[in-house]
Amino acid sequence: MIRKLEEKDITTIVELEEKIFGETLGVEMLHSELSNPLVWFRVIENENQVIGYIGGYFYDGAGEIINFLIDDIYQRKGYGTLLFNSLIEESRAAGIKQITLEVKETNIKGINFYTKNEFKQISVRKHYYKDGENALVMMKEIKWKY
């Protein structure tokens, strides 16, 4: 089941971020973003347990994914695709024309997923992450369904 991120999910999301990324957006940021009308956060559940989430901003006809993760034991089982497709459909409905994101250049699984979903690399942000790693900036044009 895919639904909006709720206050009760924040602890689980922070734990998943630490587990998967080794860092987190943090409890305070997630709390503050819940009330931001430009922010879009969705979680995906399996048997009433949050196993992943996607979050981003929609503004001026554009979107930006700020975080996307699926618990490692649920990866490569279709959950990420379901969650990602929900973002694309809501983007399309909101009139979003393109979506951008940053991904660590060593995150091969992530890069492959985004490439499979029609994202193209448009630039590199040198030493973008806290650990000094570069970020690949990727973009997807949102196509309208007729």
Residue ranges and their predicted role:
Residues 49, 71-85, 92-94, 98, ...:
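Conserved glycine-rich acetyl-CoA-binding loop
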Residues 36, 110, 133-134:
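Short Asp/Glu-rich motifs
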Residues 32, 106, 129:
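Positions that flank functional sites
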Residues 102, 115, 120-136:
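Conserved catalytic-core motifs of GNAT/GCN5-like acyltransferases
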Residues 4-73, 84-86, 90, 94, ...:
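Acetyl-CoA-dependent GNAT
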Residues 74-77, 81, 126, 134-136, ...:
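Acyl-donor (CoA/ACP) binding surface of acyl/acetyltransferases
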Residues 69, 100-102, 137-139:
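Short aromatic/hydrophobic contact patches that present stacked aromatics
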